[in-house]
């Protein structure tokens, strides 16, 4: 239903945010900017 669709979108957005944060962290740690 609608609720599960919303949950799926939120999960996807959370993964995207976490991924970009990890990229920034790696960038700072390893100087790969």
Swiss-Prot record:
Gene Ontology biological process terms in this record: defense response to bacterium
Free-text tissue specificity from the UniProt record: Expressed by the skin glands.
InterPro entries in the record: Antimicrobial_frog_2
Subcellular location: Secreted
Chain ranges passing through the membrane: none
Domain of life: Eukaryota
Role description: Antimicrobial peptide.
Stated family: Belongs to the frog skin active peptide (FSAP) family. Brevinin subfamily.
Name recorded for this polypeptide: Brevinin-2DYa
């Amino acid at each position: 239903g609608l609720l599960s669709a919303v949950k799926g979108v939120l999960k996807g957005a959370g993964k995207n945010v976490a991924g970009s944060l990890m990229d920034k962290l790696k960038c700072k740690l390893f100087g790969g900017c």
